[in-house]
Amino acid sequence: TLFRSDTVNLGSRLEGITRQYGVALLVSQETARLAQGIVFREIDFVRVKGKDIPIQIYEPLALTSEADATTLAQLKTWEQALAAYRAQQWDEAERLLKKLKDVEPDVRLYDIFLQRVADYRLDPPGADWDGVKKFDSK
């Protein structure tokens, strides 16, 4: 009999969506909270297959001691872009995402959110939108 704890199951789900965001590693909010000496970027608020409760997911960017000024500035701009996105402030989110892309043109995350902004402009999510991205596959 194979027993898979909730933590192992979540880890497996996160591994499955990591490549969709174009990042090397994703961790849960709990892991990011417990890790010391690492700078994390919040990536998204997701509901993975088999879980009812959405979770925030993070990407480790650098050791705190090695994070340079550009990384920290980009992180701050990303946090502002994510806040604007979640507040359905599409123009501001787009402006900030384009600013991020100017510095890091190959970061897929920015393209993903620019596409979401474009999609939500055409088909707004509504006032009760919680910002959660649902993943139905493993």
Give the predicted meaning of each segment.
Residues 126-138:
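Intrinsically disordered, low-complexity, charge-biased linker/tail regions
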Residues 11, 18-92, 98-100, 104-109, ...:
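Cytosolic regulatory/linker segments at or just downstream of nucleotide-handling modules
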